[in-house]
């Protein structure tokens, strides 16, 4: 069984296979590959890496993606396990790590889009857009194509993770989705508080 392909047609069977036959190391490998794939577009249109060569941009992008995604991976597994148990679930952290990895499998297939964008736009892809209302250096068609694909894959990944959380905790996918939303709410509130504290500290110092 190839989880990278089967996830598209039989997501629940793929998740069950990962739980029964794979280790956390395998899940970590998936997360690393996914981070490298998504890292290509992480700094697109930001202007943060202007002046760097393409190899340096790739190295920084991949490094940043790994530094963010790997800790977030393990933290998400812990939080989904904890929140799920509060909602009546019976899952464990190991199985949660594997279904989260299963949920990001579709995102790996964004790699060809990232490579194509680099081939077409080169270093300009990572420059800040010029113009008051400019949002991207990509053509409108390519930008819309990329946005639609990313939106669709993100929704599909959320559906898979909802099913996976439900599978691990022995409850419905809807409750699994609720687990995701509760965690997202916690992250949002904590981020908002951190922003308020940071801004308040800066204003106080001024």
Predicted regions and their residues:
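Alpha-helical transmembrane segments with an aromatic anchor "belt"
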Residues: 54-121
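Membrane-helix interface segments in multi-pass membrane proteins
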Residues: 38-68, 114-151, 188-206
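Hydrophobic alpha-helical segments of integral membrane proteins
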Residues: 1-18, 66, 79, 83, ...
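Transmembrane alpha-helical segments in integral membrane proteins
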Residues: 74-85, 152-169
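Membrane-interface alpha-helices at helix entry/exit sites of multi-pass transporters
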Residues: 25-26, 93-99, 174-178
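N-terminal juxtamembrane cytosolic/stromal segments of multi-pass membrane proteins
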Residues: 1-51
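Alpha-helical transmembrane segments of multipass membrane proteins
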Residues: 34-42, 68, 72, 76, ...
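Interfacial loop-to-transmembrane junctions
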Residues: 163-186
């Amino acid at each position: 069984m190839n989880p990278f392909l089967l996830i598209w047609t039989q997501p629940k069977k793929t998740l069950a296979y990962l739980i029964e036959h794979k280790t956390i190391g395998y899940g970590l490998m998936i997360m690393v590959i996914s981070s490298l794939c998504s890292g290509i577009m992480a700094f697109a249109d930001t202007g943060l890496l202007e002046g760097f060569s393409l190899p340096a941009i790739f190295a920084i992008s991949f490094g940043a993606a790994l530094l963010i995604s790997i800790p977030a991976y393990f933290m998400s597994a812990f939080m989904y396990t904890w929140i799920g148990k509060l909602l009546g679930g019976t899952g464990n952290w190991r199985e949660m790590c594997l279904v989260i990895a299963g949920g990001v499998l579709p995102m790996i297939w964004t790699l060809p889009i990232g490579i194509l964008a680099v081939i077409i736009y080169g270093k300009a892809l990572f420059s800040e857009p010029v113009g008051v209302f400019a949002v991207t250096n990509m053509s409108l068609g390519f930008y819309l194509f990329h946005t639609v694909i990313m939106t669709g894959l993100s929704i599909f990944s959320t559906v898979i993770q909802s099913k996976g959380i439900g599978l691990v905790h022995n409850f419905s996918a809807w409750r699994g989705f609720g687990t995701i939303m509760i965690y997202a709410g916690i992250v949002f509130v904590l981020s908002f508080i951190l922003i308020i504290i940071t801004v308040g500290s800066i204003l106080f110092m001024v």
